[in-house]
UniProtKB/Swiss-Prot annotation:
Keywords: Cytoplasm, Methyltransferase, rRNA processing, S-adenosyl-L-methionine, Transferase
Enzyme Commission number: 2.1.1.181
Family stated for the protein in its record: Belongs to the methyltransferase superfamily. METTL16/RlmF family.
Gene: rlmF
UniProt-recorded name of the protein: Ribosomal RNA large subunit methyltransferase F
Organism: Klebsiella pneumoniae subsp. pneumoniae (strain ATCC 700721 / MGH 78578)
Gene3D superfamilies, alphabetized: Vaccinia Virus protein VP39
Catalytic activity entry: adenosine(1618) in 23S rRNA + S-adenosyl-L-methionine = N(6)-methyladenosine(1618) in 23S rRNA + S-adenosyl-L-homocysteine + H(+)
């Protein structure tokens, strides 16, 4: 009997343990990274960044029909099941307005990253159209290479370069442009030192020493910003006021529950008329995203 992962969204494709033979068929290079755990079961070494990248290539090919996917060394290699959960819960949020999951939704992914993970999943699962913003030139080029390598995606995903280091929505959302929702996985740490300490914790959890030399990935824009995620999301909330009539739902992951109170206070200050929190769980990891809107229920139900 296959074990289920507790807490994943019902529509998430990753409830069962990884079917490694099927994944190897989708991406044969994965075979070279398969080992046996102490129980004699097949697994991969999750401390090996190349093994994790090969697993992601296999998952994206097998479940989401992504034939070309790669990221440069040193960039975040995202856990696919957790990223899929955000997309499915966002679909439920949109369905709450229209009565069903919209098939033609337009979504803005803030900081789409070198991996382009949210647009890849959302385009496949729901047929949504995505705009991905990105400030890092290398990440932008990587995301564009993924789109170009999967011709069917060119009609569903476009990229937009954020040229202003202090801006989030400004310069990305154009005049007269509308979105059903925005999503974002904000930088969590408030300094490079905090980000390094997080990497050390991962090493300890995997039973590795600092001398292991493993790179858990992540560029500065992916991992930290001045003031951490509260500062980043607070800026997002303030900027969102300028686009109150162009976006139905603004959303962002919030990694720590104790970061919510100051964000709720700010949402009240800026006049958000509806605020929703969606709790998520992937195995032992608890996460959540908050969503806010400046439109009442009747306005959100109407198409742009």
């Amino acid at each position: 009997m296959k074990a289920q992962k507790p807490g994943l969204h019902p529509r998430n494709r990753h409830h069962q343990r990884y079917d490694l033979p099927a994944l190897c068929q989708a991406h044969p290079d994965l075979q070279g990274y398969i080992t046996l755990n102490p129980l004699g079961e097949q697994t991969i070494d999750f401390a090996n960044p190349q093994a994790v990248k090969a697993l992601n290539k296999a998952l994206l090919a097998h479940f989401y029909a992504v034939k070309h996917w790669d990221i440069p060394d040193g960039f975040l290699c995202p856990p696919v099941p957790g990223r899929a959960d955000y997309i499915h819960h966002l679909a439920d949020l949109l369905a709450g307005d229209s009565g069903e999951v919209p098939k033609d939704a337009t979504i803005l992914d803030i900081g789409t990253g070198a991996n382009l993970i949210y647009p890849l999943i959302g385009a496949h699962e729901y047929g949504w159209r995505f705009t991905g913003s990105e400030i890092n030139p290398q990440a932008f080029a990587s995301a564009q290479a993924i789109i170009n390598g999967n011709p069917g995606l060119t009609r569903q995903i476009r990229l937009r370069r954020q040229k202003e280091s202090q801006a989030i929505f400004h310069g990305v959302i154009h005049k007269n442009e509308t979105y059903d929702a925005t999503l974002c996985n904000p930088p969590f740490h408030d300094s490079a030192e905090s980000a390094r300490a997080g990497g050390e914790r991962k090493r300890r959890n995997l039973g590795l020493g600092a001398e292991s030399g493993l790179n858990f990935g992540g560029q500065q824009q992916e991992l930290w910003c001045e003031g951490g995620e509260v500062a980043f999301i607070s800026q997002m909330i303030r900027e969102s006021q300028a686009f109150a009539r162009q976006v139905k739902w603004f959303t962002s992951l919030v990694s720590r529950g104790d970061n919510l109170p100051p964000l709720y206070r700010l949402l009240t200050e800026v006049g958000a008329v509806k605020v929703v929190k969606k709790e998520m769980a992937q195995g032992q990891k608890q996460s959540r995203f908050i969503a806010w809107s400046f439109m009442d229920d009747a306005k959100r139900r109407r198409p742009f």
